[in-house]
């Protein structure tokens, strides 16, 4: 079984996975942003 959590916790590595630009780059990421907007989240993604 592979490790599932982010072991490298530097800011730049986290933003590559869950930053706004990273989310908007894929269809699934855009879906996440869409659902967070619908729910009324103040923070859509991790700020830069």
From Swiss-Prot:
- GO molecular-function term, one example from the UniProt record: structural constituent of ribosome
- UniProt GO BP: translation
InterPro entries, alphabetized: Ribosomal_bL34 (IPR000271), Ribosomal_bL34_CS (IPR020939)
Keyword list (alphabetical) reads:
Chloroplast, Plastid, Ribonucleoprotein, Ribosomal protein
Tell me which domain of life the UniProt entry assigns to the organism this sequence originates from.
Answer: Eukaryota
Record family assignment? Belongs to the bacterial ribosomal protein bL34 family.
Q: What is this protein called?
A: Large ribosomal subunit protein bL34c
The lineage, from the top, is: Eukaryota, Sar, Stramenopiles, Ochrophyta, Bacillariophyta
């Amino acid at each position: 079984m592979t490790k599932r959590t982010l072991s490298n916790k530097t800011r730049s590595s986290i933003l590559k996975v869950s930053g706004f630009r990273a989310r908007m780059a894929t269809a699934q990421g855009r879906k996440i942003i869409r659902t967070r907007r619908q729910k009324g989240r103040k923070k859509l993604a991790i700020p830069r």
